């Protein structure tokens, strides 16, 4: 609702346009939470495969479907899914598999104590090459903020949610 993921997706589009290998990794949302940005980036990945324009796109869902509105409904706990997802991303970073990584809602597993912040920071600081990592979410750990190149805080001034309106197709997803 505040634009954190949408802003990061804009950066992913820029990376794609430069021919970078783009990976989007959703750490809280499940595969059932379908957003327009996913369709757009997948279509751009397909365009790359067919024409060579832009770069390849990877989209992976690491979350179990847990949300603030309902409990998780997967065989794997949200904590285990976050740890497994981070291990996967760490391996991709170590092997320079991508040029641009969007770790969507990745601050939450750190804030909730599901991931070791020191280990995450060490992995990011020591990643090889010139890989770019964008992390979204609130409550970023101070250690992460200190090593980041850019930190942005999205602040809602006014939103239709405030007057009881539900999310709108085309606006929130």
Annotate each PLM feature.
Residues 138-173:
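Phosphate-binding/switch region of NTP-binding enzymes
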Residues 11, 37-41, 115-119, 147-151, ...:
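Short, glycine/charged-enriched secondary-structure capping and boundary segments
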Residues 14, 40, 123, 143-144:
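Hydrophobic/aromatic ligand-binding patch that stacks against planar heteroaromatic rings
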Residues 58-61, 135, 152-153:
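Structural signal for conserved beta-strand scaffold positions within catalytic alpha/beta enzyme cores
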Residues 68-132:
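Phosphate-binding/switch loop-helix module in NTP-utilizing enzymes
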Residues 44-47, 130, 147:
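Structured helix-beta-strand junction loops
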Residues 28-32, 65-67, 107-108, 139-142, ...:
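Conserved nucleotide-binding/hydrolysis micro-motifs of P-loop NTPases
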Residues 2-94:
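Conserved P-loop
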């Amino acid at each position: 609702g505040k634009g954190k993921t949408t802003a990061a997706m804009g950066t992913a589009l820029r990376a794609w346009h430069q021919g970078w290998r783009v990976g989007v990794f959703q750490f809280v949302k499940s595969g059932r939470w379908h957003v327009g940005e996913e369709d757009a980036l997948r279509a751009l990945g397909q365009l790359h495969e067919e024409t060579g324009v832009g770069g390849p796109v990877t989209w992976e869902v690491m979350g179990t479907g847990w949300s603030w509105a309902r409990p998780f409904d997967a065989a794997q706990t949200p904590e285990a899914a976050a740890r497994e997802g981070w291990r996967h991303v760490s391996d991709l970073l170590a092997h320079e598999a991508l040029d641009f990584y969007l770790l969507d809602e990745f601050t939450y597993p750190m804030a909730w104590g599901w991931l070791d912040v020191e280990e995450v920071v060490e992995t990011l600081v020591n990643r090889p090459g010139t890989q770019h990592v964008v992390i979204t979410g609130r409550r970023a750990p101070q250690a992460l903020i200190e090593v980041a190149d850019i930190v942005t805080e999205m602040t809602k001034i006014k939103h239709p949610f405030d007057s009881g309106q539900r999310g709108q197709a085309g606006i929130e997803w």
